[in-house]
Amino acid sequence: MNRRTRALTVLACALLLPLAGCTTEHTDRPARTPDDTIRAATLTLTDRCLTRQGLTPPRPGQRPANRAEEQRVAAALFGRPPAELSLTLANGIAVRAHTDGCLAAAQRTLYGDQKRWFQVSTVVNNLKPEAAHRDLSLASVRVRHRAELTDWQRLRSRALDASTRVLHTTSH
């Protein structure tokens, strides 16, 4: 098989392989983890948002047309400065996020309360560093942040339900 034939074969497989499962029932697919479900819905929502603005959603390995396009996509996806949400961690590092942009809109759709999700997810994602910084056990830091952990579970459960709906409406 020469290089050209091999390249065409690979291209054909790449184009047809995604269609191979199109006739199977949804139950034949492996179940997504909750994290994968939320990530997939977030990607779906951010892609829709960018597309509505006439922008091409970024993909791994795909380069933007030019620097200006890359900046437009980044601003639309992540929001424009200044960041409206901020939380200072136990170690003094400030974490910031935007309330505008496609990612923020997706978070509002999935979690309901973007500001509270930002606060609790930042705290929960930094429990181990806080324990190390304060020289405390992780268990004692978890007790200290019981309210944030409870809210994290509630908001994440809401996001999982919303994500399932987003993906269900996308697949039909």
Regions found by a protein language model. Give the residues of each.
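Mitochondrial intermembrane space
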Residues: 2-12, 16-172
